[in-house]
């Protein structure tokens, strides 16, 4: 990428995940900072995750301040580099699509295939790191709730179901902070498990409702998964559930220790004896279970408590959609100054 595509200079590695490495980079012409994610296409699962992210982000025709923006995606094979576009007839692109669909490598495995995603650079880490390194702050909580609900409404309006909402996948941008009064900007990221709901039926031009787009692949991160996701039959209402877990945990600073990474993470759960169980899993076993919200007295008022309970309803039909959620959070934030003590 550095030699074949001199548009960017890589500065340093800032993150490494299960299927890619993220670098801080600069655009040579403007010196603007960007994030560049390098994904090696050596396994079908890597290719599928990368294509899902590309399809979701490239399907968005307008930008949203709280959704990560894809500047461009570069496909590299050995020394050959080309810009990737959705629906391209390029043989390299079609080989990746075939690999994703068939679940087996559809190109010469001796060739080095890479995808380079050029996106917004976020300098403040993720939501998990940001909140847990600071004392609880009502103003920050309010700002984050409004930003996240706005992002989710935007994604659902664009027929995108995220399917892996969690604090680790929400990035923090502090570049706009020119005064101490401003809260950082959140950006929903990591669309590797996302699903773009395409139109079907008699009128393919009519936008499909993400709340009527049923999916069957159980995916996500267990502590944020809705009960119907565990069951394998769900819609975009699963994103509402995940956001409910995040907001509840943020307001009350509920955390757990990840057994694999030993990292402290924001996330609410149910206690069963000495064990902690994901809320969605517990509700699948007992849909009538009453969640103890709030855990701490006076941590939220009745309207906030009721909204979180609805977001975490065992029956997805009892949850608000993303547009109602955004409206109700705005009302709580601005019409009821005593939502949190």
UniProtKB/Swiss-Prot annotation:
**What CDD domains does UniProt report for this protein, alphabetically?**
STKc_PDIK1L
| Recorded superkingdom | Eukaryota
SMART domains recorded? S_TKc
* Tissue spec. comment: Expressed in liver, kidney, pancreas, spleen, thymus and prostate.
Where in or outside the cell it occurs: the entry states: Nucleus
Query: One Pfam family this chain carries?
Result: Pkinase
SUPFAM superfamilies on file: Protein kinase-like (PK-like)
What GO CC terms are in its UniProt record? cytoplasm; nucleoplasm; nucleus
Enzymatic reactions: L-seryl-[protein] + ATP = O-phospho-L-seryl-[protein] + ADP + H(+); L-threonyl-[protein] + ATP = O-phospho-L-threonyl-[protein] + ADP + H(+)
> Is Nucleus among this UniProt entry's keywords?
yes
* Keywords, ordered alphabetically: ATP-binding, Kinase, Nucleotide-binding, Nucleus, Serine/threonine-protein kinase, Transferase
A Gene Ontology annotation in the biological process aspect, one of them, is: negative regulation of G2/M transition of mitotic cell cycle
- Does the record's keyword annotation contain Nucleus? yes
Q: Which residues form the active site?
A: 164
Q: Where mainly found?
A: nucleus
Ranges for domain Protein kinase: 8-334
Its family remark reads: Belongs to the protein kinase superfamily. Ser/Thr protein kinase family.
Name this protein carries in UniProt: Serine/threonine-protein kinase PDIK1L
Taxonomic source organism: Homo sapiens
What lineage, starting at the top, does this entry show?
A: Eukaryota, Metazoa, Chordata, Craniata, Vertebrata
């Amino acid at each position: 990428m550095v030699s074949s595509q001199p548009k960017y200079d890589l500065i340093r590695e800032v993150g490494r995940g299960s299927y890619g490495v993220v670098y801080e980079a600069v655009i040579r012409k403007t010196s603007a900072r960007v994030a560049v994610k390098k994904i090696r296409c050596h396994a079908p699962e890597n290719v599928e995750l990368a294509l899902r992210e590309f399809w979701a982000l490239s399907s968005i025709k307008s930008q949203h301040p709280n959704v990560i923006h894809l500047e461009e995606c570069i496909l590299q094979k050995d020394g050959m580099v080309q810009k990737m576009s959705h629906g391209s007839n390029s043989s390299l692109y079609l080989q990746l699509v075939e690999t994703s669909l068939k679940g087996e490598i559809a190109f010469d495995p001796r060739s080095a295939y890479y995808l380079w995603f050029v996106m917004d650079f976020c300098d403040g880490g993720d939501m998990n790191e940001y909140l847990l390194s600071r004392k609880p702050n009502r103003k920050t909580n309010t700002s984050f709730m409004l930003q996240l609900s706005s992002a989710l409404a935007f994604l659902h309006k664009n027929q995108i179901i995220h399917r892996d909402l969690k604090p680790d996948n929400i990035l923090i941008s502090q570049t706009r902070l020119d005064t101490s009064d401003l809260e950082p900007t959140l950006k929903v990221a990591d669309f590797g498990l996302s699903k773009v709901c395409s139109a079907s039926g008699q009128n393919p031009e009519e936008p499909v409702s993400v709340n009527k787009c049923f999916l069957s692949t159980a995916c996500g991160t267990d502590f944020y998964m809705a009960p119907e996701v565990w069951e394998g039959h769900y819609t975009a209402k699963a994103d509402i559930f995940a956001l409910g877990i995040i907001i509840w945990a943020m307001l009350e600073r509920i955390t757990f220790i990840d057994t694999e990474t030993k990292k402290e993470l924001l996330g609410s759960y149910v206690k069963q004896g000495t064990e902690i169980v994901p809320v969605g899993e517990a509700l699948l076993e007992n849909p009538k279970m009453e969640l103890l919200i709030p855990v701490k007295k006076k941590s939220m008022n009745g309207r906030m408590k009721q909204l979180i309970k609805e977001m975490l309803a065992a029956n997805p039909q009892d949850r608000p959609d993303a547009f109602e959620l955004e409206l109700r959070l705005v009302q709580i934030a601005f019409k009821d100054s005593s939502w949190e003590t």
